[in-house]
């Protein structure tokens, strides 16, 4: 990791963010490789789990960690979600199906814009159309780019497997 961080530190702007995808145990090694810059993680909840070859030994992997690193507060353009089941703090109602709520039910406004939470649900790509086995959904990448950068800024994707960020 030393060479990777050497080059990131050389290239990153003062208010730039470095986002890296991973899963355990790699995530722990990644965070420990630069504890000074690690700030938080976003959990991408996948709709299509992976690691079927280990299904008899451990649970399928239905999420990935997105580790966020930076030296100084980066650009952070808040992009609010509509109040639906993409949002972790959805109302908990005992006599209703919360996935079908619209408007105000039992005093809870479910159409209100919500701040993003640390767990996000973005539909996985159709793996029959994937160019790369770890390809990320364009919608997820678009959200992250809009969240952490401004128009006309340069984005480096040095882990570009299939070119989804293009």
Task: Map each language-model feature to its residues.
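Core catalytic lobe of class I
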Residues: 1-166
């Amino acid at each position: 990791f030393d060479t990777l961080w050497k080059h990131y530190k050389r290239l990153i702007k003062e208010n730039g963010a470095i986002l890296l995808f991973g899963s355990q145990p790699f995530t722990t090694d990644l965070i420990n490789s630069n504890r000074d810059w690690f700030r938080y993680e976003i959990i991408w909840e996948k709709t299509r789990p992976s690691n079927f070859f280990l299904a008899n030994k451990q649970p399928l992997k239905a999420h990935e960690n997105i580790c966020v690193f930076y030296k100084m507060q980066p650009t952070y353009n808040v992009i609010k979600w509509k109040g639906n089941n993409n949002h972790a703090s959805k109302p908990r109602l005992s006599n209703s199906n919360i996935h079908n709520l619209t408007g105000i039910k039992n005093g809870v406004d479910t159409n209100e814009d919500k701040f993003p939470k640390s767990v996000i649900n973005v539909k996985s790509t159709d793996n029959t159309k994937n160019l790369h086995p770890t390809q990320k959904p364009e919608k997820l990448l678009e959200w992250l780019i809009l969240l952490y950068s401004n128009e006309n800024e340069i984005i480096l994707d040095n882990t570009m497997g299939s070119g989804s960020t293009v």
